[in-house]
Amino acid sequence: MSYVFVNDSSQTNVPLLQACIDGDFNYSKRLLESGFDPNIRDSRGRTGLHLAAARGNVDICQLLHKFGADLLATDYQGNTALHLCGHVDTIQFLVSNGLKIDICNHQGATPLVLAKRRGVNKDVIRLLESLEEQEVKGFNRGTHSKLETMQTAESESAMESHSLLNPNLQQGEGVLSSFRTTWQEFVEDLGFWRVLLLIFVIALLSLGIAYYVSGVLPFVENQPELVH
C-alpha cells in the first residue's frame, strides 16, 4: 500500500527518483555512486527520501542518508519525509536521525495527523502517538529545568548586588557571625552553669560598684544618700 498523497505519479523522468519509487536499491546505489544528487526533486518538490519513505523502503532511506541526503528537506507543501511515512521501521530511522515528530507542514499538520487521515496501520499510529508524547514530556522537562536555572541565577545576582550596595552590612554580618561562634565555644569550654554563675557574680559586682559610687542601692527607692 502506498502512503503518498492522492494523484501521486508512479513515473518520473529522473532515474534516481524512479529507482526510489520502484524500491530498486542496487540501481539507486549505482546512480548515487556515479554522482547523482541525493537531494534532487520532482515537480512537487519531493526528494528521493520522500518517495522512499512513503513506500517504506528504509534501506534506500539509509542509502540516501549515507550519500548526504537532507533529512530535513520539505516538499512544496512543507512536508518532510516523516509526513509521508506509513511504516514503523522508516519512522524509527528518520526520528533516530533527528527529524522532529511534531513538525508541522504549511497547513499545520503533523506526521501523526496525516497518518490518521490516510488510515495507516494501527501500530504506526501508536508509535507516532508515543513519540509525540515523549517529545512533549522532554520539552516540559527542559522548560522546567531552564526556569529553575534562571530563577537561581536571578537570586544569586540579587544577593550579589545587595552585598555590593551594602558593604558595611556584609562586614557587620561577618563580625556578628564571628562573635557568635566565639561565644558558643566559650560556653562549651566553661560549661553552662559556670557561665551562669559567672554572669551572676559579675552582676553582683556591678551592683556593689554602683552603690559604692552613688551611695544609692539600685532598685531600692527613698534611700538616704551616704556622706563620704
Swiss-Prot record:
Coiled coil location: none
Signal peptide feature range: none
Keywords, alphabetical: ANK repeat, Membrane, Repeat, Transmembrane, Transmembrane helix
UniProt keyword Protease present: no
ANK repeat coordinates: 11-40, 44-73, 77-103, 107-138
Transmembrane segments: 190-210
PROSITE patterns according to UniProt: ANK_REP_REGION, ANK_REPEAT
Mode of membrane association: Single-pass membrane protein
UniProt cross-references to InterPro entries, sorted A to Z: ANKRD_45/46/60, Ankyrin_rpt, Ankyrin_rpt-contain_sf
Principal subcellular localisation of the protein: membrane
Domain of life according to the entry: Eukaryota
Gene Ontology CC terms, in alphabetical order: membrane
Pfam family, one: Ank_2
Name of the protein in question: Ankyrin repeat domain-containing protein 46
Natural source organism: Homo sapiens
The encoding gene: ANKRD46
